[in-house]
From Swiss-Prot:
<keyword id="KW-0249">Electron transport</keyword>
<dbReference type="GO" id="GO:0046872">
    <property type="term" value="F:metal ion binding"/>
</dbReference>
<keyword id="KW-0830">Ubiquinone</keyword>
<keyword id="KW-0999">Mitochondrion inner membrane</keyword>
<keyword id="KW-0496">Mitochondrion</keyword>
<dbReference type="Pfam" id="PF00032">
    <property type="entry name" value="Cytochrom_B_C"/>
</dbReference>
<dbReference type="InterPro" id="IPR036150">
    <property type="entry name" value="Cyt_b/b6_C_sf"/>
</dbReference>
<feature type="transmembrane region" description="Helical">
    <location>
        <begin position="178"/>
        <end position="198"/>
    </location>
</feature>
<feature type="transmembrane region" description="Helical">
    <location>
        <begin position="288"/>
        <end position="308"/>
    </location>
</feature>
<feature type="transmembrane region" description="Helical">
    <location>
        <begin position="77"/>
        <end position="98"/>
    </location>
</feature>
<dbReference type="InterPro" id="IPR048260">
    <property type="entry name" value="Cytochrome_b_C_euk/bac"/>
</dbReference>
<feature type="transmembrane region" description="Helical">
    <location>
        <begin position="320"/>
        <end position="340"/>
    </location>
</feature>
<keyword id="KW-0812">Transmembrane</keyword>
<dbReference type="Pfam" id="PF00033">
    <property type="entry name" value="Cytochrome_B"/>
</dbReference>
<feature type="binding site">
    <location>
        <position position="201"/>
    </location>
    <ligand>
        <name>a ubiquinone</name>
    </ligand>
</feature>
<dbReference type="InterPro" id="IPR005798">
    <property type="entry name" value="Cyt_b/b6_C"/>
</dbReference>
<feature type="binding site" description="axial binding residue">
    <location>
        <position position="182"/>
    </location>
    <ligand>
        <name>heme b b562</name>
    </ligand>
</feature>
């Protein structure tokens, strides 16, 4: 009798994606983050669904509805904090996943990489809108500052901002539409993730050595299913440690104060996972220049296939490029730190130097390092 999973049309798709999928035998734990992102997405959709059942997207009641969820709803506090800290875990996995793609040259799979970039932008948009929903001080002023950046676009900027706001300031209309978008976008992310997987399975996974692994493949199940389950258990352990011991560690105390348009917080800053981009934005005194730098700080990843000058796929055998990647990581951590600091000396100059360094490493140093390594190997 033929195996059910190989004959049933629906099970055949699952089988070819997660069971009988030929996978390289040497992929490391850096390849775990794709499945961890899937777990984060499912967790965020489920917790978000239960939060949406009790949340009201009205400026007068939004903040108190979040307090009501935490105080009066059965296990509402754990759902709320799992959702808030789940977003942080999502971005940790996302940054690791993109970093692995950069290090091991996964950007050579053009379709997979470009859909991954769309996924990154969509996830960032979703997280930003989610941060506005509790309608605390940081929610309100964060929304005001970030949406206002669009006014830097020549000719249409001001009209565009008012169109997004649904009025002349961030108000009820803005909150309602942000809630609507925040609810629908995760489902769009799910669809995009499926397309991402579809294109990945057309080419097969990359591997640390960057050498084609067609001659040495193993089935995905049980080898990598077990490995992924271990990763998932560790992810959930870290998330629950955060939720149960320090739920507000990554949040901002200002967001427990209900939004007040007449009182600006001393330091307006986004969630920690946007701080690096925020630091790049602030490092340029001109508004339009800052906005362009902000967009380019993420969009630069789309250029990675064009900037790839090495004759090798992976950085496993490229010591100079390896050093540059870790300098880039240190630079991003510096930018994240600067993004959370007030705009004063010496933070301004550190932020400007770190921003210049960020673009310099990616656009100049890495292609030059690859060319040097090619010449050293007489290629």
């Amino acid at each position: 009798m033929t195996n059910f999973r190989k004959t049933n049309p629906l099970m055949k798709i699952v089988n070819n994606a997660f069971i009988d999928l030929p996978a390289p035998s040497n992929i490391s734990s850096w390849w775990n983050f794709g499945s961890l992102l899937g777990v984060c997405l499912i967790l965020q959709i489920l917790t978000g669904l239960f939060l949406a059942m009790h949340y009201t997207s009205d400026t007068t009641t939004a903040c108190s509805s979040v307090a009501h969820i935490c105080r009066d709803v059965n296990y509402g506090w754990i759902i709320r904090y799992m959702h808030a800290n789940g977003a942080s875990m999502f971005f940790v996995c996302l940054f690791m996943h993109v970093g692995r793609g950069l290090y091991y040259g996964s950007y050579t799979f053009l379709e997979t990489w470009n859909i991954g970039m769309i996924l990154l932008f969509t996830t960032m948009a979703t997280a930003f809108m989610g941060y506005v929903l509790p309608w605390g001080q940081m929610s309100f002023w964060g929304a005001t500052v970030i949406t206002n950046l669009l006014s830097a676009i020549p000719y249409i900027g001001t009209n565009l901002v008012e169109w997004i706001w649904g009025g002349f300031s961030v108000d009820k209309a803005t909150l309602t539409r942000f809630f609507a978008f925040h609810f629908i976008l995760p489902f769009i992310i799910t669809a995009l993730a499926m397309v991402h997987l579809l294109f990945l399975h057309e080419t097969g996974s990359n591997n640390p050595s960057g050498i084609p692994s067609d001659a040495d493949k193993i089935p995905f199940h049980p080898y990598y299913t077990i490995k992924d389950i271990l990763g998932m258990m560790l992810l959930i352990l870290i998330l629950m440690l955060l939720v149960l011991f320090t739920p507000d560690l990554l949040g901002d105390p200002d967001n427990y104060t209900p939004a007040n348009p007449l009182n600006t917080p001393p330091h307006i800053k986004p969630e920690w996972y946007f701080l690096f981009a925020y630091a790049i934005l602030r490092s340029i005194p001109k508004k339009l220049g800052g906005v362009l730098a902000l967009v380019l700080s993420i969009l630069i990843l789309v250029l990675m296939p064009l900037l790839h000058k090495s004759k090798q796929w992976s950085m496993m055998f490229q010591p100079i490029s390896q050093c540059l990647v870790w300098i880039l990581v240190a630079d991003l951590l510096t930018l994240t730190w600067i993004g959370g600091q007030p705009v004063e000396h010496p933070y301004i100059i550190i932020g400007q130097l770190a921003s210049i360094m960020y673009f310099l490493i990616i656009l100049v140093m890495m292609p030059v390092a690859s060319t040097i390594e090619n010449n050293l190997l007489k290629w």
